[in-house]
């Protein structure tokens, strides 16, 4: 009997050792952003945040429906160009990505979203133009604040905090710039600000002396710029050069480390809004800032943390939905997610907007955006 038991135990051990390892699956998440050109710093920042999350998930080990998942990020350069963004969308769809983070630019996100919608691919943009989520698509989940929230915040801030009476608006005519400028104008008027001039530029301009000379004659209390930091930085330097006394206001796209780095001391008159609460106000946020700098040896720009949260939320949704391949089930799960990330909580309304997205106003101090304190 003793011999039989011993043999039985040996046989059981052999069977155990012969059992196959847990099945593995590679899950590819797409990323679309400007990785070259004037906005490359923002695109790389977003990519860095997503890669941090991918690396952590792979080290941690995620099991979905009995399979160990290895995540991979497929990052593509859309050059902040709508036509290129549509081409990138088709490339990512053809590569069967499970979901896409981005695009960063509203002008890219609007046409590209149609490609992703037709393919049934979940899309998690930070692009803020309200038109993105007004198309009736069920696959879009905006992981940042919209222009209505960002522009609205600055209209109220200009009157209540800066005590401004008059404002001039400069619009870069991009989908982002136009959208946030329109939302700011609506809020400004509602708060009693007088719009004394509106000027237009384009996304490639760096010389604003003509516009600023015209505005100086009208002496606005504040200037709101609907556009990106790559233009706002030279603009604010030229404001000082022209002797304008106005403050420069803008949205999340000028609330970057590059704004302070390029504009230098001139950036001290910049006030900008970002979605979410300030990271340095929570232990998790401070840890993320440190971890980012330790990993990449640069300061984060704006949305790295949202992309980090976005990847982690996708993994959470896959686990709850029990699938990495059925995109319709993943979309259904994302629609009812209540995910707690580093930047805040993520849940979405029927259009795919972030519910109750908080906003924070920042100033540039010592080259970096810091929360405004009265």
State the predicted function of each range.
Residues 1-8, 23-374:
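Extracytosolic ligand-binding ectodomains
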Residues 11-12:
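Repetitive helical segments and hydrophobic/amphipathic motifs
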Residues 15-16, 47:
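Residues in and immediately flanking transmembrane alpha helices
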Residues 17-23:
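Sec/Tat signal peptide C-region and signal peptidase I cleavage site
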